[in-house]
Amino acid sequence: MSKLRMVLLEDSGSADVRRHFVNLSPFTIAVVLLLRACFVTSSLGGTTKELRLVDGENKCSGRVEVKIQEEWGTVCNNGWSMEAVSVICNQLGCPTAIKATGWANSSAGSGRIWMDHVSCRGNESALWDCKHDGWGKHSNCTHQQDAGVTCSDGSDLEMRLTNGGNMCSGRIEIKFQGQWGTVCDDNFNINHASVVCKQLECGSAVSFSGSANFGEGSGPIWFDDLICNGNESALWNCKHQGWGKHNCDHAEDAGVICSKGADLSLRLVDGVTECSGRLEVRFQGEWGTICDDGWDSHDAAVACKQLGCPTAITAIGRVNASEGFGHIWLDSVSCQGHEPAVWQCKHHEWGKHYCNHNEDAGVTCSDGSDLELRLRGGGSRCAGTVEVEIQRLLGKVCDRGWGLKEADVVCRQLGCGSALKTSYQVYSKIQATNMWLFLSSCNGNETSLWDCKNWQWGGLTCDHYEEAKITCSAHREPRLVGGDIPCSGRVEVKHGDTWGSVCDSDFSLEAASVLCRELQCGTVVSILGGAHFGEGNGQIWTEEFQCEGHESHLSLCPVAPRPEGTCSHSRDVGVVCSRYTEIRLVNGKTPCEGRVELKTLNAWGSLCNSHWDIEDAHVLCQQLKCGVALSTPGGAHFGKGNGQVWRHMFHCTGTEQHMGDCPVTALGASLCPSGQVASVICSGNQSQTLSSCNSSSLGPTRPTIPEESAVACIESGQLRLVNGGGRCAGRVEIYHEGSWGTICDDSWDLSDAHVVCRQLGCGEAINATGSAHFGEGTGPIWLDEMKCNGKESRIWQCHSHGWGQQNCRHKEDAGVICSEFMSLRLTSEASREACAGRLEVFYNGAWGSVGRSNMSETTVGVVCRQLGCADKGKINSASLDKAMSIPMWVDNVQCPKGPDTLWQCPSSPWEKRLARPSEETWITCDNKMRLQEGPTSCSGRVEIWHGGSWGTVCDDSWDLNDAQVVCQQLGCGPALKAFKEAEFGQGTGPIWLNEVKCKGNESSLWDCPARRWGHSECGHKEDAAVNCTDISTRKTPQKATTGQSSLIAVGILGVVLLAIFVALFLTQKRRQRQRLTVSSRGENLVHQIQYREMNSCLNADDLDLMNSSENSNESADFNAAELISVSKFLPISGMEKEAILRHTEKENGNL
């Protein structure tokens, strides 16, 4: 950390300056000299740097010197490497690094030693981009250790191929320092050969060889153990040990054959068409064949493409044509499919094989004009039997080797979406011999069926007598919208590009079962009518789904048309699915005991027991018709299981009918300890239900029930937190004797709150609130004077006055805030927008950021919807703002499609750590207001995002003041006109606002008086609109380049410093003239004060002269309470959460 030291000097070079400095205050002198130091440091950073080589034999060799601050200096050779030499050589236009030396060939340098311990990767653009100790810092180096280099611009280097019959094949030889030498074959491969061929302009590399295949050379062996990536411009630019360093002899000389020296060509012989037949290759003037060992569709695809017949129909082994003769040039060809020529695929050395000519390879290709694919007999072009027509022959696809991946490829090729169903049609044995297409397999990503590998075509026999049939989605898909948990919400179906809702009278239990199964959400739990999940907007489909319940997709259900206008959005149907496809107990002695396993996305996995409790177990036993939960054995009581261990945390109360009804969280879930999987032992009595326990046992004297066991009854005392904005914060309420009631705050403290939080699975208590912090409750006040020791498993096990014994009122209702309470916000020092900034999560009593690893647009959409900030957004680059003192809580958040809150998304476990702004997530959600159907972005129909959907504004009372607020909010110029009566067309969805009465100076439309959200008697023919000037009212500063910015800053700083100094000097001069007497003795006793900057410019909290020496340094630790600041709160999902955070700050501030 930078410090200032005050030094008293006995002498000074200028009496006049000394005399005036004496009269300046210490603070003024400190500021002036501090600014001066900053000016000098800034100037150093902006100084132009230069590099040169001195005292060498030519411009590409010599001692390395760097110029900075107009002063030349040297570089110490500590850690000097060939990587650093490569950087210097490239920087100076001498691209070939020859040698790294401590320059002893000439006189030592002089002046500064600017750099030491230089460490380069080799790809830096300048030497000063490499790591080093710092400018002017070195470890006692002298100029005897000055670093030097020897480079080459290539003009003195040559390469040739010899003894190969032409200039593009043969033994590699390099001329260096006037002498020809060879290259050792150690680690020599096709990448090296590619560099050689490219450098000699001989085309691509066909083959390489070692062991002096082109004869032994003579002279030096210049290179050994070369490392090339294939992109180098010259062989000597590959990494190497150094010129002339090797452990080889000339029996290991390397050679290459390039395409221009191989006389290569490919042809088809003896085929029925121009694109079929036996393959032959010409190599070094002679034709030969290819052996069929390993010959497959990838190899055929390369050959066909090379021959100008781009689609490979069949890869033929033991080709049905007259046998070839002559050489067998290639064997064991293995192509990836993207190579430009067959000989560029992997293969044995040219001419080496283990074949004879009855194994010659061939192909049947097509130019695509004679290939056709279609679906017939299914009622539309996107359903039916798969038919293919190849070279004018019509055939079917045999279902042998046929599956959903292959069907997906067909649907995609035909523009019919994805495959919903694949089946087969049985034919008689007589019809089985036909033209058939056989597929080995598709990976599902191909753009057409012809791209799938190893397919065969012809008059073959389909052993199964079955032809493939497909039903495609045709871009028709369902979804659930607006639910609080995944797999629940309003039913919407997409036809083409349009989403629409479904009337509750048109959706049966069978249809809901199909929907849940299609969405991989398990089984249907309930069907809810009356727009339970909110009203949709847009289309209401006038069709009844007549499913039987066994269909795999909703699109496969028959539909019956309904008359239009018979339904409204107030009757939109909703569905709740179980989310989990299946849930089961395994490895137990009976079906009603065992390890808990969930099936999600067709994969079974065990459930972690870190949050598994008896309430969760009760619900599972009931769902499986196994009575009630008797115990939840810990550890791997029924075995560890295989596959994934699900970290999802259920939060059941014990009264739910299905596990899908319980809230679930996944964000920040810890990795499951080895072997810690959930288990349960149910009573097994399928007719048994949970009866009410004797309420007399629920008093303070009730014995503690171990968490791993429970009585087979529902305790009358259920517990919940109300009005806190989440399940882990709020007013404490207990269900007792048929009524919900509260707890009085007398003696209410953290020990009591700990029991509540632990009982609810919400971690530990952060705050125990009183005075009806979360609002006054109703009904009985059940408990008073709670005195928990903090270890009880239920709040009613604590000592108290007894049930209903109290002298309180509801203004004394107790509440809690637990560590598992979570909230979300976007915050930025540079923006007041609540919908833009750094993504932060409130957890364990503190705000922390969210990492940007694997952050996707889907996850951003979940965040923006959760915050009520439109339905999507974008990820921004790291903010340039100063990073605030805040840790990172969680990283690797990966939301799938479906969750409505970030809490339901998997992530890395909670871990508090420091993070740079570049590691954090910065988001800007789309504007919650937009203008639609206008000629420009600043005119059109006004639409607002609210409650999870877009809606319009009614034109009642709509005027220019309202329009002015809209224009300002959208960043447009002043309002020109406020339109009524759907000037830009009628919108869809809700009419969110009516009777808007702005003054014109509000910052947003929702700050204006209006009727309650969604309360309107208007129709869309009254949609309001605006026309704004298309001139932005937001000032966007012009961005200067880095160099311009630094120069401008330095110039301004210099002018300011000069002005300050002149003003101070004149002021002090005037004061001196006004003095009546001056004691020369006193003046001589005055000492000068000089402030020296010891390291770098000061931070404000480092000025010892301006701060009391008694101030203590702040701890670097992040105390949870210290991280909560009222001044930085933003609204978070409602007033309740804001109240929680405000109270937490107040409580922690009093500690």
Swiss-Prot record:
PROSITE patterns: SRCR_1, SRCR_2
Intervals of motif Internalization signal: 1091-1094
Lineage: Eukaryota, Metazoa, Chordata, Craniata, Vertebrata
Job of this protein: Involved in clearance and endocytosis of hemoglobin/haptoglobin complexes by macrophages and may thereby protect tissues from free hemoglobin-mediated oxidative damage. May play a role in the uptake and recycling of iron, via endocytosis of hemoglobin/haptoglobin and subsequent breakdown of heme. Binds hemoglobin/haptoglobin complexes in a calcium-dependent and pH-dependent manner. Induces a cascade of intracellular signals that involves tyrosine kinase-dependent calcium mobilization, inositol triphosphate production and secretion of IL6 and CSF1.
Name of this protein: Scavenger receptor cysteine-rich type 1 protein M130
Organism: Chlorocebus aethiops
The SRCR domain, residue ranges: 51-152, 159-259, 266-366, 373-473, 478-578, 583-683, 719-819, 824-926, 929-1029
Protein's gene: CD163
Domain notes from UniProt: The SRCR domain 3 mediates calcium-sensitive interaction with hemoglobin/haptoglobin complexes.
Cytoplasmic side: 1068-1151
